[in-house]
Amino acid sequence: MRGKNIGFVSTRFAGIDGVSLEASKWSEVLEQNGHQCFWFAGELDRNPEKSFLEPKAHFQYARNRWINSQIFGRKRRKHVVTESIHALRSFLKTRLYTFLHQFHIDLLIVENALTIPLNIPLGLALSEIIAETQIPTIAHHHDFYWERERFSVNGVSDYLRMAFPPNLPGIRHVVINSEAQEQVALRLGISSTVIPNVLDFDHPPVVDEEKVLSFRKSLGLNHDDKIILQPTRIIRRKGIEQAIELVKGLKDP
């Protein structure tokens, strides 16, 4: 049986943000199992031969930023904003169809673009395509809009219900922790699978020993002092208190 052509879609696959890193890990495992992975986003640092760059899919695209400025922090939106949303949705939908046909995509993996409403036109375009084509889709959710205060007051509740995430039969939803699983079930009646973010301890990154020693020295640490890192924002849902309890449990002054 031939491997699948798998299309990853998001606003950005570049740099070291969590979504980009996790997508890379997934694609590595999928390719090891005989599949081919292709990429659609507004910013890409992937293999150009397997990439479909569309700058208007980026959350920082100027028109999208203007749309966001008009819909968050207020309870209604103007007609001109709705028109702008649908103009961009229509454009992105056409580009997504081109991506599907160009690379003969068998399966979509949508990384957070159906989760956090940073690019609402992209989420709407994806939802319509999935509904129209019934293409098998994995919606990989990293953080939902209700987890961020900036989205709590908005003028797009209709779009949030429609596409963030959409409740469609062809979509399998994946979340990164059990709390998200409980919330998506409670709020939306959607079942999901938990796949935590992972680290490949068998293949650690290459370490520059000189930089490590210099870093330790700058902090006044000895060579054998332990460093405990919590590489997240300081917000409630990151559970920083658990890291504090872990350090306490080490009993290492």
Question: How would you describe each model-predicted region?
Answer:
Residues 1-253:
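Catalytic cores of nucleotide-sugar-dependent glycosyltransferases that transfer UDP/GDP/TDP-activated
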